[in-house]
Each structure stands twice: as C-alpha cells, then as structure tokens.
C-alpha cells in the first residue's frame, strides 16, 4: 500500500451514505441508501433504461420505481444491493478506484458479527482494496467533537444508540442500542397524516413524508402544553407544505407529535425506553467516579438529532433523572448530521492510525474473522 494513497471514508447509514476522502472537513457526496427497481416494462426503444437505479437517481425517478433500503436498523439485509451502493459510491460519486485506497467503513454498535465479516469480505474480494477498517459510529462522532470523554447519543435513520467513552476507551457493557430511529418516525408521520385525511402509501410517497418531517418537525419542550396550544390556537402551530404536484397541504400538531416518539416510544407502540432514559441507563451502568464527566458531556450526533429544541428538551429530561446537584451539559454540534463521517476523516488521517488497518495480506492469511481482532 503506497504511503501517499489517501483513505476513503464511507459512512453507510441506514438512510444516507456519506462518503469522501480522509482529511476533508465534510463528505464529498451524500446520497440516500436506496435502490430503485422499475415497476413497469420499458416500451420506448432506445431509451437508456437501467435494471436498477441507486441513490439520487432512484430518488429523482421514484415515481416509476419501487424503492428498497438495503440497510435496515443498521444491519445490511441485502448484500447484492449493498454492493451496488458501494460500487456506485466508488465509481460514480467519488470516481476513484478502490484498489488504490484503504477504506474506512462505519457500523452501529452491537451489530451481528456476521455483518462486519461480510463487509470485510466484499471489500477485499469484490473491490480488491489494499486495506480497510470498520469503526463504531459513535466513537467517530466523539472524535469530531474534539473530546475523549463523553456519552454519545447517536440517532440516525435505523438505529439509536448511546455509547459512553472515557479517555478514549469505550465502555462496552454500558452501551445501549434501540432499533427505533428516523425511519420509524417517518412511518409514524405517514400514520398521523392518514388521520388528517392525507394518504401516503407508496415507497415514493414515503420519501415525500420524510422530507416534510425533516423540514417542519420540532421537539416540544412541554408536550402536553404544546398539544393544548395546538388545539386552542391552531394557527400558531400550522405550516404549509407544497407537494411535488403543486398542491399545498397543512401540517399542524403532527410537527411535534411525530418526533415526540423519541422521548415516548409507546406513542408508536414500542416498548423501548425513550432517548433520555437510554442515556441515563448507560451512564448508570458506568463506574460511579466517571458519571459526573459523562453528565457534563452528552454529545448529540446523527440526522435524527437535528430537530429544533432537542438539546433543551434533553437537558430538561436528564436534569429530572440525575441527582439534584448534577451539572448537565448537552452538546449539539451544528454539523452533527455528518459528525460520524468527519470523525472518520480525522481518524483515518492520523499517522498513529496507519498501523491499525487490516491489510490484504492479513485478510488472505486469516479470512474475514480478522475484523473482530483488529477492530473494536
């Protein structure tokens, strides 16, 4: 592996793939982790129609496609589709040849072991990379925030997890993972719209709802108070949204009722604890001496933490759970949507990291299981 070859950093999330070159301060390309298959046969001869579309192209042609997500809850469910996404990332988006660059991939904590092994296998056997590494998403977010101690609350499209890290050491016994995140909120939003009389059912319409959710939703500081306000003074909560066909729809109390499920998952019929409780439980599983520092460094990361007022609400909730004199500090970096990728970019450009890569020789010698020995 030549010294000067720059690493490629690929953060393959359940909803979006963020990729770029190590050392950059933002990902070069971000596109949805979507594969689109045409619903109808092609009758126009000479039209360059593909068997499948990836990412933005699938998003743009979604009206005639059936959309699939190859990654669900952080776990790859369809490896053929995943390979298409990686192929698209390397050759069409980054325009690099993977056999010339080491590749850093990311994954959620407490993922099935087979998931990493298969990732490693595809990278070495299908893309012939010289070296690769798999890192846990939350650790990278902490790197990006410039800390070595803190509890990272990372919520993306498929997985929400809280990971306590002390002086750079991850405390694996205290990691909490919930398979409830952005995509579940999108489905909940679709259900709330049905109650209002708007029906969104197809996979293409689900993407419209995701856009409404991202643009208009916010977290209520006091949910009951906000509900009362939305019933008494409706106009204060309502916003208009223009659909792709030009029609306008009104979005009202759904704006805060949808993301409320993060703090109260029973709203969508889930038995898991809310964000604030998982963070609290993670801290309580740690040694009593380090809890104070964790309470003081709660770092948010991931696209599902982008809602307005989430920092204030989390601070309030944590304050009511923590001991009375405890100082709570929630850090919500403005670039947190991409902080996992930024952390990966920092990590893979460190000179001390260069000896951590899994090389092609090591892979040929030990097979895919090498990934458990070399990557945390």
Swiss-Prot record:
It is found in: Cytoplasm; Cytoplasm, Cytoskeleton. The modification Tele-methylhistidine is found at residue 73. Coiled coil: none annotated. Pfam families: Actin (PF00022). ATP hydrolysis occurs in the polymeric state. Unlike for mammalian actin, ATP hydrolysis occurs also in the monomeric form and the release of inorganic phosphate (Pi) is more efficient. Disruption phenotype: Normal asexual blood stage development. Production of gametocytes is normal; however, following activation, gametocytes fail to egress from the host cell and to form beating flagella, while axoneme assembly and DNA replication proceed normally. In addition, redistribution of nuclear ACT1 into the cytoplasm fails. Severe reduction in the number of ookinetes produced; however, there is no oocyst formation. No defect in female gametocyte activation. It comes from the Eukaryota. Its EC number is 3.6.4.-. Actin is a highly conserved protein that polymerizes to produce filaments that form cross-linked networks in the cytoplasm. Polymerizes into longer and more stable actin filaments compared to ACT1/actin-1. Has ATPase activity. ATP hydrolysis leads to the formation of a stable intermediate ADP-inorganic phosphate (Pi) actin, which is followed by the release of Pi. ATP hydrolysis affects filament stability; ADP-bound actin depolymerizes much faster than ATP- or ADP-Pi-bound actin. Monomer (G-actin). Oligomer (F-actin). Polymerization of globular actin (G-actin) leads to a structural filament (F-actin) in the form of a two-stranded helix. Unlike for mammalian monomeric actin, monomeric actin is able to induce oligomerization with ATP or ADP. Mg(2+), which is used to coordinate ATP, is required for polymerization. ACT1 and ACT2 differ in their polymerization, filament stability and helical structure. Unlike mammalian actin, Apicomplexa actins do not form long and stable filaments. This is Actin-2. It comes from Plasmodium berghei (strain Anka). The lineage of its organism: Eukaryota, Sar, Alveolata, Apicomplexa, Aconoidasida.
